[in-house]
A protein has these predicted regions:
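Conserved phosphotransfer cores of two-component systems
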Residues: 109
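Glycine-rich, positively charged N-terminal anion/phosphate-binding segment
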Residues: 38-57
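Gly/Gly-Pro- and Ser/Thr-rich, intrinsically disordered tail segments characteristic of DNA damage-repair
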Residues: 77, 112-123
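Alpha-helix capping/helix-boundary segments
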Residues: 100-101
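Phosphodiester-processing cores and adjacent nucleic acid-binding clamps
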Residues: 50, 63, 82, 96-97
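Surface-exposed amphipathic alpha-helical tracts and adjacent flexible/coil segments at the periphery
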Residues: 1-22, 27-34, 53, 59-69, ...
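Glycine-rich loop at the start of a catalytic domain that most often binds anionic cofactors/ligands
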Residues: 41-46, 77-83
Length: 408
């Protein structure tokens, strides 16, 4: 019998964690300021992690903590307390790449599940079984695996060893993220969450006897070639095949993404997964049109099926530019008596056509006839960041709804 796969979402902040849960994620993964592979200014504090666990658990969801950097000898002494603090905060699992960290997590928080990170590069069933023998509940498979090999891993591993795979988001041009380019070119280690993304830079070819003569490797509208630049992964059209290959957790990339991005992508994959689960033994899976429409309303690079069907077209894209056709302009805090109470995240004006995405996946389209500030003053637009305002809307709206507008 087919098990219902988990939809796993990224959470780079407490706010994003809450939106991911509200928009349909079964679990979220996040990090504290250290050891989390995202050395960004926004990560969770221990207090926020505790609050996030309470929020998620109250809604039947799980929280996983990433501990997937490769620590140095000097850093090892920090880990026991770090692991215990996270366990006391209520996390359901640790995501780990280093064998030493795996042993420390088992020693200092044996009650918390241990998941082996994609950074470990699990590409075959023997490696997966070793992780299981070392106490891992789950392995996050290498992103380079095709569906056929994932199915082989499933068939040759204990059934209680869970398999997790990435289904959407940015891809790294190196095998399982094992890249030294950032360290070499920018002094920032990608294996420690500090990647400067030199693979996104523009490159030209120089011949040693012709210094200063830069030759273009390929054609692009802005000159130069993005030969190392990867597309974004999108598997929604064949989510059924990933589930049937035996994947237990469908992972969305993006701990550095905004809460709008995460909510929108989670909403789309929630609908895709629920469509499959409604008739899982039908070999003619049809993705609802609105799923791809939703995925096109977030900032992204050109989409690719990744390596699931082989290597062709998995990596190279001709440009570093994003597709950004929509602007996120606000959140709905509450609704009553035909009036939506909102917070500004971007400017719009009276007469503009807007969309409101709700946590249940529904979309409300309207053109507000007026805008009113928090002190009751009628306004032509919403010029101030984070300002509170109201707009008329006859359709009831849910808290956590997101307001957006197509670029002109």
């Amino acid at each position: 019998m087919l098990q219902q796969p988990e939809l796993l979402a990224p959470a780079g902040s407490l706010e994003t964690l809450k939106y991911a849960v509200m928009y349909g994620a079964d679990a979220v993964y996040c990090a504290l300021p250290e050891f989390g592979m995202r050395a960004a200014p926004v990560n969770l504090t221990v207090g926020e992690l505790h609050e996030g666990c309470i929020f998620a658990h109250a809604r039947g969801k799980k929280v996983y903590l990433t501990l997937n950097t490769l620590p140095t000898n000097e850093e090892l002494s920090k880990l026991p307390r770090y692991i215990q603090d996270a366990a006391e905060a209520g996390v359901d699992a640790f995501i780990i790449a280093d064998l030493g960290v795996l042993a420390l997590a088992k020693k200092y928080a044996p009650q918390v599940e241990r998941h082996v990170s994609t950074q470990a590069g699990i590409t075959n069933y023997e490696a997966a079984k070793v992780c299981y023998e070392l106490g891992a509940k789950r392995v996050v498979l290498a992103r380079e695996l095709p569906l056929t090999e994932i199915a082989q891993i499933r068939d040759n591993c204990p059934q209680d060893l869970e398999l997790e795979a990435f289904v959407h988001g940015a891809m790294c041009m190196s095998v399982s993220g094992r890249c030294l380019l950032s360290s070499y070119m920018a002094g920032r280690s990608g294996n420690r969450g500090e990647c400067a993304q030199p693979c996104r830079w523009k490159y030209s070819l120089v011949e040693e006897h012709r210094p200063g003569q830069y030759m273009e490797i390929g054609e692009s509208e802005d000159n130069g070639s993005y030969i190392l630049n990867a597309n974004d992964l999108c598997t929604a059209p064949f989510i059924d095949l990933i589930c049937k290959a035996g994947v237990d957790s469908l992972k969305i990339e993006g701990r550095a993404k905004t809460f709008y991005y995460v909510a929108s992508v989670v909403s789309a994959y929630r609908r895709a997964l629920d469509t499959f689960l409604a008739d899982p033994y039908n070999d003619s899976f049809e993705l609802p049109d609105d799923v791809i429409e939703e995925l096109n309303r977030t900032s992204h690079r050109h989409y690719s099926p990744g390596f699931y069907f082989g290597k062709e077209q998995a990596q190279q894209t001709p440009s570093h530019t994003y597709v950004r056709d929509w602007d996120f302009i606000g959140t709905v805090d509450s609704w009553e008596n035909g009036v939506a109470h909102c917070t500004q995240r971007g400017k719009f004006a009276v007469g503009d056509s807007i969309e409101i995405l709700q946590p249940d996946g529904s979309v409300v389209k309207l053109t507000p006839a007026w805008i009113e500030s928090a002190d009751g003053e009628r306004m032509d637009a919403t010029p101030h960041p984070m300002m509170q305002y109201t707009i008329p809307c006859e359709t009831p709206l849910m808290a956590y709804s997101l307001i957006r507008m197509q670029k002109q």
